[in-house]
Structures are given as C-alpha cells and as structure tokens.
C-alpha cells in the first residue's frame, strides 16, 4: 500500500472587528417612522456621488449602527456585513440620486428584492429601502408596496 501524501494547505485565521469611526447623537433613541430614520442619515447622503447607507436596528427599533457603502454598485454581502457585525435584527437602506430625481430604477428594484431575500435567509428584516431626491423628497419601497 503506497499512499501518496497530499501536501498540507495553509489556512488563514481571520478576526473581524467592528471599529467605531465616530458616533452621532440621536435624540429620539427610537425609529418610529420613516422621517426619524431619514433624519439620522440625511447628512451622510448629501453628495454629488451616489451613496448607500444602512441603518441597523435592534428589536426595539433603536439604531445600533450606521454603515455606508461607497459605491453605486451594492452587494448584499457588504450591506449585511454591517448588520451582522452590529447584531442588528432589522435594517433600513437609503441611497441618494445625485440628479435629484427620486424615481427608482430597475437596478434599485432588483437590489431591493435581493436584499429582502438575503435578509430572510439571515433573519434580518429589510424594513424599507428609500431613494432620496432633492428637497427632502423620497421614494419608499415599503410605502409603495414594493416590499
């Protein structure tokens, strides 16, 4: 019996840490409606580039963290990484349209469906996905029965 030994493979051991970049004071402590959530993120969405912001909530709808995906192309892996590391039970997603037009695109609708599906698998509810336009105008996927 002449068994050939397979060479050993090196496996990386990785430690992930959530590092607080900064904090914001949120006076109402709880997200009771869409406007509460918008007030928490509106300053992060003022940009000439498209930004995607995730608000992570606990079971009492209290914000536990806020994360930003610095890309127009959003992958559920990046969105839920923030949520999982924050021990969130729910998320609300926001993104701006620098053009000021708050109408959603087919890509916006597709990523919303993907986020909802991934959230169901992970046990993290997608509460809403909101597209922000000019002058505090917005499109809510939930209010328009798209979630």
Question: Could you tell me what each predicted segment is?
Answer:
Residues 98-103:
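Short, solvent-exposed loop/turn segments at secondary-structure junctions
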Residues 97, 131-133:
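Conserved beta-strand edge residues that scaffold enzyme active sites
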Residues 91-97:
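Short beta-strands and strand-loop turn motifs
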Residues 1-87, 109-118, 122-125, 133-147:
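N-terminal beta-strand/alpha-helix entry module and adjacent surface
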Residues 128:
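Beta-strand-loop-alpha "switch" segments that mediate conformational coupling across diverse proteins
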């Amino acid at each position: 019996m002449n068994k050939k030994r397979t060479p050993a493979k090196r496996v990386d051991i990785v430690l992930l840490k959530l590092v607080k970049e900064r904090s914001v004071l949120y006076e109402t402590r709880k997200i009771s409606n869409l406007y509460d959530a918008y007030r928490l993120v509106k300053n992060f969405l003022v940009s000439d580039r498209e930004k995607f912001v995730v608000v992570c909530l606990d079971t009492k709808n209290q914000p536990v963290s806020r994360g930003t995906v610095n890309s127009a192309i959003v992958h559920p892996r990046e969105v839920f990484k923030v949520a999982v590391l924050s021990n969130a039970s729910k998320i609300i997603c926001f993104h701006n349209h620098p053009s000021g037009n708050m109408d959603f695109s087919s890509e916006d609708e597709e990523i919303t469906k993907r986020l909802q599906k991934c959230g169901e698998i992970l046990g993290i509810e997608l509460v809403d996905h909101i597209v922000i336009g000019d002058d505090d105008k917005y499109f809510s996927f939930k209010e328009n029965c798209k979630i």
